[in-house]
């Protein structure tokens, strides 16, 4: 429950930059997701967060680099849309990739990679979590069908905090 409060506090933080808030969301999303055990090579394998496209986070990601999530070190990798994302457990698709969503998300359908973005139409394109702005606050919406097809599980606590959950509950 405390972790849920952290998400809410970050969403309200008026002094934090937009991408500092989004970095906190991306980090915290991973705390509330369970991946199939076969996704990781071994118990010590890191959790790889891939930034696809132009990195708009900048220094905001420095805060979450090398933290741990579920006893796994978080490693941030930077990828282009043409690169294979098989090494990623979570992928943030940058707004720079708006026109290439189908190209990026197509190969990821039914793959246990948590996809997150802040692009309009992301859920409709098959993405899993979309960051949105509601009343000047960063919120998020979830495509539960895409999450389930990928073999991932999202905590009910996180789903309760979502502005919208699309798909079959």
Regions found by a protein language model. Name each.
Residues 1-169:
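Short hydrophobic alpha-helices and adjacent helix-cap/hinge residues
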């Amino acid at each position: 429950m405390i972790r849920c409060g952290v998400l809410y506090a970050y969403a309200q933080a008026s002094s934090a930059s937009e991408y500092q808030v989004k970095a906190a969301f991306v980090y915290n999303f991973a705390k509330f997701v369970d991946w199939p055990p076969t996704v990781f090579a071994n118990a010590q394998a890191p959790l790889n967060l891939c930034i696809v496209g132009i990195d708009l986070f900048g220094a905001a990601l420095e805060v979450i680099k090398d933290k741990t999530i579920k006893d796994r070190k978080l490693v941030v990798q930077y990828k282009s849309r043409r690169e294979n994302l098989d090494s990623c457990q979570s992928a943030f698709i940058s707004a720079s990739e708006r026109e290439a969503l189908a190209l990026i998300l197509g190969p990821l359908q039914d793959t246990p990679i948590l996809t997150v973005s802040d692009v309009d139409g992301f859920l409709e394109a098959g993405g899993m979590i979309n960051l949105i702005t509601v009343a000047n606050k960063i919120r998020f919406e979830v495509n539960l069908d895409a999450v389930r097809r990928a073999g991932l599980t999202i905590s009910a606590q996180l789903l309760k905090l979502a502005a919208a959950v699309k798909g079959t509950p």
